[in-house]
Amino acid sequence: MNKRNFIATGASLAAVALLAAGCTTTGGASGDPAAQRQAIDAAADSALSRLYAQAAGSRELVASSRGMLVFPNFVSAGFVVGGASGQGVMRKGGKSTTYHRMTEGSVGFLAGAQSQAVFILFMTDDALKRFEASTGWTAGVDGSVTLLTVGADARVTTLTGQQPVIGFVLTNSGLMASA
């Protein structure tokens, strides 16, 4: 295979992977916005139950947050060029208030697909207000996010809650390799 065909094939595979990632974010909900919100809420409830079961202390941390974004099905896919997307909900005091979409792009050595649940907790009123006032919030630019990995016997401590914005990621399924 010559270099030109290899690059064209790689680009085609990357485009298909990105298209597949975009097509799987709706979770089977119909085109009806109310049905989509209901599906996102149900998936968020399920993801929160998993978080509470896997990370001791997470329920208390969520309860003390000023607001929380839950992206129950954040799907990543790629082959050299990758992308990720998911729909989520902002919750305040346990109630769904607004609905959001999160996207991500990456370039590098990667191949595969993976689904994750992403939780972003706003621990201060100021951090939440900055998010709500933005028209395209970017982690690291509009706010720094302390990312916590949740694995076996994960425990959330009181030190965790001292950061203004905290993120949790739970793997749902799939395998993603990167370098």
What is each model feature region?
Residues 24-179:
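Small-residue-enriched, tightly packed secondary-structure blocks
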Residues 20-22:
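C-terminal motif of bacterial Sec signal peptides marking the signal peptidase cleavage site
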Residues 2-11:
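Bacterial N-terminal signal peptides that target proteins for export
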Residues 10-13, 61:
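Alpha-helical transmembrane segments
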Residues 1-2, 66:
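Poly-acidic low-complexity segments
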